């Protein structure tokens, strides 16, 4: 049995799925995914991120809410691919439970975003999200997105 090739989604296609644009598009590339189950993506953290101007001057740290938003955007991409939707539909961040931040995300880091579907019902998707840097957990949470 042959090993399946990763299913990569580049930024140009991501922009056809998500309505977000600079400075709020927080997924650079999808490394692989399986419809209805999971997705792995990356976000490269640049010293030029607008949030670093004030968070914190001289000690830039990516705000936790942006890590959670990146996980939600990764889930949105998975939902579009799973439901074979075209751009134009929206997924709203609907809830966060058990969010934990375990290490800072800094300029120069590459953040890996891993999302896994827990359940989907009536347009609401519950999922787990884990953001890592160099294999270390930066953030983990249970999240929900609602389709409009």
Curated annotation (Swiss-Prot):
Its EC number is 4.2.1.59. Coiled coil: none annotated. It catalyses: a (3R)-hydroxyacyl-[ACP] = a (2E)-enoyl-[ACP] + H2O. It is found in: Cytoplasm. Disulfide bonds: none annotated. One of its GO terms (biological process) is lipid A biosynthetic process. InterPro entries: FabA_FabZ, FabZ, HotDog_dom_sf. Belongs to the thioester dehydratase family. FabZ subfamily. Involved in unsaturated fatty acids biosynthesis. Catalyzes the dehydration of short chain beta-hydroxyacyl-ACPs and long chain saturated and unsaturated beta-hydroxyacyl-ACPs. This is 3-hydroxyacyl-[acyl-carrier-protein] dehydratase FabZ. It comes from Haemophilus influenzae (strain PittEE).
């Amino acid at each position: 049995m042959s090993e399946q090739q990763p299913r990569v989604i580049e930024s140009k296609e991501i922009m056809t799925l998500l309505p977000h644009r600079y400075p709020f598009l927080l997924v650079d590339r999808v490394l692989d995914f399986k419809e209805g189950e999971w997705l792995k993506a990356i976000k490269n953290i640049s010293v030029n991120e607008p949030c670093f101007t004030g968070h914190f001057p001289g000690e830039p740290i990516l705000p936790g809410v942006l890590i959670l938003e990146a996980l939600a955007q990764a889930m949105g991409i998975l939902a579009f691919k799973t439901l074979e939707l075209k751009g134009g539909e929206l997924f709203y961040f609907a809830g966060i439970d058990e969010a934990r931040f375990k290490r800072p995300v800094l300029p120069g880091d590459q953040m890996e975003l891993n999302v896994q579907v827990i359940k989907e019902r009536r347009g609401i998707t519950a999922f787990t999200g884990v953001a890592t840097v160099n294999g270390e957990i930066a953030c983990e949470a249970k999240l929900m997105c609602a389709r409009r």
